[in-house]
Amino acid sequence: MSIRRSVLVAAVLCALSVLCAPQGQADPSGAGGGGCRQGSVMTGRLVPGTGSAGQNIRRAATLRECVSSLLPGIGAGQFSVTIPWNAPGATSAATFAWSDGSVSAATGFGNGLWLITDGPASGHGIQVDVADSWNGWYYSYADVAVTSATFLS
């Protein structure tokens, strides 16, 4: 009986050390390609388009405190995309208009992960992170807070 109790106590202590460890906030300027540490509320509104019922969702958010070797001299940007409503497999074209006047074009599937295809950071992926575990890019036009944007490659 004491072996079982010892194993149980060890398992509980191990789980508690993982669960109680301080949870850090993503730091886009750390390891990797950097990114933007803050974002605004990402707006969403229905517009005529190619999605279900002939509707698209237009989204826009401001990205601030950008620090990355992929964005030299750039401190902020404006993210915008139009996503076909209720069409999760459809690709979308997004733009990042940067504070130095340059523009990056990107493609993605409306899940927050975008591949930059032209302009600054071309060839790299960027994840636009939102406050909740939200999966509403193409299902909902509700506004949602953007917490950061992080380069993944």
For each feature predicted by the language model, list its residue ranges.
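Secretory targeting and sorting signals
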Residues: 1-26
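A short, structural micro-pattern
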Residues: 10-11, 55, 143
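Cleaved targeting-peptide boundary
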Residues: 26-37
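Predominantly extracellular/secreted and cell-surface proteins with exposed
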Residues: 44-123
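Extracellularly exposed regions in secreted/surface proteins, prominently low-complexity, repeat-rich
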Residues: 120-153
